[in-house]
């Protein structure tokens, strides 16, 4: 089985994040999806990224966590708080299959199915700080639902954008 997306949902330690970065950079043929730590404000997530020195053209950091329906908890706890990386891997695969790796898995086309609400509602001003600092936000977009709203890698330069790095990787491996 060829693996091109790597995530360890819900594990947000610096050691694991730097391990994923080392792994995907060593392979150079896959993409890492890192979950921001649970329960953090936008400024705390930015501090985490900066302090942990998370940087890679082969990875992204996604924020915030999301609530989804929980069929097992119906009646008692109908929602479950989940890390975003699994959803981002899913929307990435869906857009890869429908449009290609060159299309950013973000925007109103990137609705995260089964989600109900966000752990934290990122506003426009917060998005304007997080996005250029290479933190991909998930937003609730009126009329569409909860959407992936960023597609940046954890680096600036030629490979700032996820689809640029992934398209380059796709061409090299074809």
What spans do the regions from the language model cover?
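A glycine- and small-residue-enriched flexible loop/hinge signal that marks low-structured segments
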Residues: 1-174
